[in-house]
């Protein structure tokens, strides 16, 4: 297949290229005129960036849009006339005629549409766990608290966190932020995106809308609090769930999640083993642990903690799996995807280097 990655030099675009490496697909890298004719090195591969145009994508089977919502709104429908478009922005997620897909959860609902939306990172991570639990016990309500890494705001935000952390001397010395409302270093900020009229942020409402759409539960009770935390990569989430059916056997819950695709059970708290951004970074699966009955809902409720790499499972990997679905690729096509090994030989972390571009 011939594939275009538009916005190839952003955080999600680079991760997309990492997934496409060694797949045998012909990949076109596209970005704005500012980046055109420059080279982009991703792993051992080097790409020449072309200036984006609809005409340059016309011969592509798949176009990944790793760009802003405004860009996607303008060009997504035009590109869909000749290619299958997988959009990573929020531009089309809430359009009734555009599918919002998490393939392991609702892939069977795909009906051949040419424009497909990829969900918000926090939603995609949560849905990997919520999907199998809903299928077994029937979700009644979901309360989500997210702990979101700096990279969710893009590569410049990662760089800002690294620089602010290095320069940190004491609290109240510097509360300024460029990519955040405040200094994120050694701080947490209970704001991700702009505030809506109901007091929730746009990010929080995205989770509400997207859980309902993907699970096909338009009346599902959902409440979210999204918090930016000073980690570089991988989001974490605390979930409080209420079910229609009783969940008496926690062992059965753990076995259900252990055997669910894209889920890694990490639930041995007595050995200090539980989900963390430190361990879920670069991992394809979503970690889930701290599974316990909720003290308010009893056997009808569960509390748990999850963590997932929002650039992979929360964005690029889900988009890749959408491509597999729409192209009807065989199961063996996913066998070549492995969790990338973080570098061990270089003293500077991969994350810090990624933050500096």
What positions do the PLM features span?
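N-terminal Rossmann-like NAD(P) cofactor-binding subdomain of oxidoreductases
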Residues: 1-184, 220-221, 255, 286-287, ...
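Short aromatic/hydrophobic contact patches that present stacked aromatics
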Residues: 64, 238-240, 303-305
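Helix-loop-beta segment of a Rossmann-like dinucleotide-binding subdomain
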Residues: 110-117, 187-198, 302-306
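A glycine-rich, Thr/Ser-enriched phosphate-binding loop motif common to dinucleotide/cofactor-binding enzymes
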Residues: 116-125, 199-208, 314-318
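Contiguous C-terminal substrate-recognition/catalytic subdomains in enzyme active sites
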Residues: 178-279
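Glycine-rich phosphate/pyrophosphate-binding beta-alpha loops
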Residues: 228-230, 309-313
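Active-site lining segments that contact anionic ligands and/or coordinate catalytic metals
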Residues: 236-238, 283-285, 299-301
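Short glycine-rich, acidic/polar surface loops and turns
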Residues: 272-279, 283-293
């Amino acid at each position: 297949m011939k594939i275009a990655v538009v916005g190839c030099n952003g955080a999600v675009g680079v991760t997309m290229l990492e997934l496409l490496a060694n797949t045998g697909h012909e990949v076109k890298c596209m970005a704005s005129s500012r980046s055109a004719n420059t080279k982009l090195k991703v792993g051992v591969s080097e790409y020449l960036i072309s200036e984006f145009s609809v005409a340059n994508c016309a011969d592509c089977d798949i176009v990944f849009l790793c760009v802003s919502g405004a860009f996607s709104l303008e060009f997504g429908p035009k590109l869909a006339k000749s290619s299958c478009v997988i959009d990573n922005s929020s531009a089309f997620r809430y359009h009734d005629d555009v599918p919002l897909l998490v393939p392991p959860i609702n892939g069977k609902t795909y009906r051949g549409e040419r424009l497909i939306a990829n969900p918000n990172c926090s939603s995609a991570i949560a849905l990997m766990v919520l999907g199998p639990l809903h299928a077994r016990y029937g979700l009644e309500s979901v309360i989500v608290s997210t702990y979101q890494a700096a990279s969710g705001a893009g590569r410049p935000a990662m760089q800002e966190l690294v620089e602010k952390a290095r320069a940190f001397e004491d609290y109240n010395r510097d509360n300024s932020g460029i990519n955040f409302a405040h200094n994120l270093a050694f701080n947490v900020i209970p704001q991700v995106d702009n505030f809506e009229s109901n007091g929730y942020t746009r990010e929080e409402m995205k989770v509400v809308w997207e859980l309902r759409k993907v699970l096909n539960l338009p009346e599902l009770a959902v409440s979210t609090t999204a918090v930016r935390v000073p980690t570089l990569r991988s989001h974490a989430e605390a979930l409080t769930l209420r079910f229609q059916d009783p969940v008496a056997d926690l062992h059965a819950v753990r076995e259900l999640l252990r055997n669910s695709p894209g889920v890694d059970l990490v639930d041995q708290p007595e050995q200090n083993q539980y989900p963390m951004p430190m361990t879920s970074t670069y991992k394809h699966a979503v970690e889930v642990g701290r599974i316990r009955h909720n003290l308010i809902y009893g056997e009808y409720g569960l509390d748990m903690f999850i963590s997932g790499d929002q650039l992979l499972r929360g964005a690029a990997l889900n988009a890749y799996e959408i491509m597999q679905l729409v192209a009807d690729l065989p199961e063996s096509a996913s066998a070549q995807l492995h969790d990338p090994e973080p570098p061990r030989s270089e003293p500077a972390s991969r994350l810090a280097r990624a933050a500096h571009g």
